[in-house]
Structures are given as C-alpha cells and as structure tokens.
C-alpha cells in the first residue's frame, strides 16, 4: 500500500 509522503500530505 502507498505510504504517506511529506508532500501536501499525499501518498507516494
């Protein structure tokens, strides 16, 4: 599953 990224709280 995609992990949360530090970009606008989106996912990788």
UniProtKB/Swiss-Prot annotation:
Disulphide connectivity of cysteines: 5-12
GO biological process: defense response
Keyword annotations of the record: Amphibian defense peptide, Disulfide bond, Secreted
Subcellular location: Secreted
Signal peptide: none
Any one annotated GO CC term: extracellular region
Tissues in which the UniProt entry reports expression: Expressed by the skin glands.
Name of the protein described by the UniProt record: Riparin-1.3
């Amino acid at each position: 599953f995609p992990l949360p990224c530090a970009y606008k709280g989106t996912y990788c």
